[in-house]
């Protein structure tokens, strides 16, 4: 009998702690022990199973997923929607936790409602509150939080700016869920985008539309010249005209220095309108259409006197060391009655031939 009693006592000690001693062995099935979390190294609170079959606390998986979407043991990827649709080992345990074991429970503020703390955190808060502490620290999802029991707020220890209200209230108030796990299975609420809050809050982040800012173009805008859009690389018509005038002016100046004796040509003395300079009136070189026609009638006289004019030019150039431009410009010295003139004028005909006439 003594041995039998010893065996009976030994079998009772081998039973799980949650099994009553007066329960019959034949009427109960062997129960599974609560697994331990490999992240927090404690007994799992609301254990969830990953696709790789590893089991962790729900909040531990949530905190680890922010650092990397992989299992903490085998490094297998965690599905994107796992936190919204976790695989609970015991859904009944979640409902039992929401009902609570006492009269009061602790809650933290969420969007459009309150969340109930998990059992472990609720015990820590209740213990600090009963002892009259002003604040206490909580480890939630790998982050240290400070619960200010005077102002009834919580915040991260290294980030005091973001605060969340907390409260101690009766267990039967309406709530959204426990520790980020929803009690309802509404598909519309499950798929809401939630912020990365370690305590399981579901504050919906403001989903603003993708704003596309216009890129600052490195190309200069098109400029308008006389109502026409021109590119900065494309020269304007005025610029091309001024360039042509500049080249013409350079060519004329080169011709003037090379052949000072040919300054009698009419077109070389005309200034471009764009140069902005008003030339002195020179009637001897201003050539009109009537002058050109009268010169064509006197072709024979011009040819006869061509040799005489060249001799006179040579004599005048030899006598003058510094030729006067005003004297050589062919100033009009016409004499009434067909008088002779000592200065000859060289004009350009419309056909491009140069003729020398005496006035």
Curated annotation (Swiss-Prot):
It is an enzyme of class 2 (transferase). The modification Phosphoserine is found at residues 290, 294. Pathway: Protein modification; protein ubiquitination. Ubiquitinated; autoubiquitinated. Polyubiquitinated in the presence of UBE2D1, UBE2D2 and UBE2D3. Multimonoubiquitinated in the presence of UBE2E1. Not ubiquitinated in the presence of UBE2H, CDC34, UBE2L3, UBE2L6, nor UBE2C. In the absence of PAR, autoubiquitination occurs on Lys-85, Lys-95 and Lys-176 via 'Lys-11' and 'Lys-48' ubiquitin linkages. In the presence of PAR, Lys-131 and Lys-176 are ubiquitinated via 'Lys-6', 'Lys-33' and 'Lys-48' ubiquitin linkages. Autoubiquitination is enhanced upon PAR-binding. SMART domains: RING, WWE. Residues 254-359 are annotated as: Disordered. Ubiquitously expressed. Up-regulated in brains from patients with Alzheimer disease. Residues 284-298 have a biased composition (Acidic residues). GO terms for biological process: positive regulation of canonical Wnt signaling pathway; protein autoubiquitination; protein K48-linked ubiquitination; ubiquitin-dependent protein catabolic process; Wnt signaling pathway. It is linked to Defects in RNF146 are a cause of susceptibility to breast cancer. This is E3 ubiquitin-protein ligase RNF146. The gene is RNF146.
């Amino acid at each position: 009998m003594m041995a039998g009693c010893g065996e009976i006592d030994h079998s009772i000690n081998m039973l799980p702690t949650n099994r009553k001693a007066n329960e019959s062995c034949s009427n109960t099935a062997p129960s599974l022990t609560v697994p331990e979390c490999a992240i927090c190294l404690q007994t799992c609170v609301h254990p969830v199973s990953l696709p790789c079959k590893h089991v962790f606390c729900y909040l531990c998986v949530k905190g680890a997923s922010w650092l990397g979407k992989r299992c903490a043991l085998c490094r297998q990827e965690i599905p994107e929607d796992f936190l919204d649709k976790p695989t609970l080992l015991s859904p009944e345990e979640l409902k039992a936790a929401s009902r609570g074991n006492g009269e009061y429970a602790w809650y933290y503020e969420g969007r459009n409602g309150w969340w109930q703390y998990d059992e472990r955190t609720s015990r820590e808060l209740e213990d600090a509150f009963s002892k009259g502490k002003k604040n206490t620290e909580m480890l939630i999802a790998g982050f240290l939080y400070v619960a200010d029991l005077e102002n009834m707020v919580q915040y991260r220890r290294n980030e005091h700016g973001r605060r969340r209200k907390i409260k101690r209230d009766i267990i039967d108030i309406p709530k959204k869920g426990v520790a980020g796990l929803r009690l309802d299975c509404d598909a519309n609420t499950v798929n809401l985008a939630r912020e990365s809050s370690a305590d399981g809050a579901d504050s919906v982040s403001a989903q603003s539309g993708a704003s596309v800012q216009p890129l600052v173009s490195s190309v200069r805008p098109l400029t308008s010249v006389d109502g026409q859009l021109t590119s900065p690389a494309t020269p304007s018509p005025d610029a091309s005209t001024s360039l042509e005038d500049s080249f013409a002016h350079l060519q004329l100046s080169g011709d003037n220095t090379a052949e000072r004796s040919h300054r009698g040509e009419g077109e070389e003395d005309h200034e471009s309108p764009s140069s902005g300079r008003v030339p002195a009136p020179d009637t001897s070189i201003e050539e009109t259409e009537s002058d050109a026609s009268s010169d064509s009638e006197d072709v024979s006289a011009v040819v006869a006197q061509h040799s005489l004019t060249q001799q006179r030019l040579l004599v005048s150039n030899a006598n003058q060391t510094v030729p006067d431009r005003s004297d050589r410009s062919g100033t009009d010295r016409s004499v009434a009655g067909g008088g002779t003139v000592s200065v000859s004028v060289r004009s350009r005909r419309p056909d491009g031939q140069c003729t020398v006439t005496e006035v």
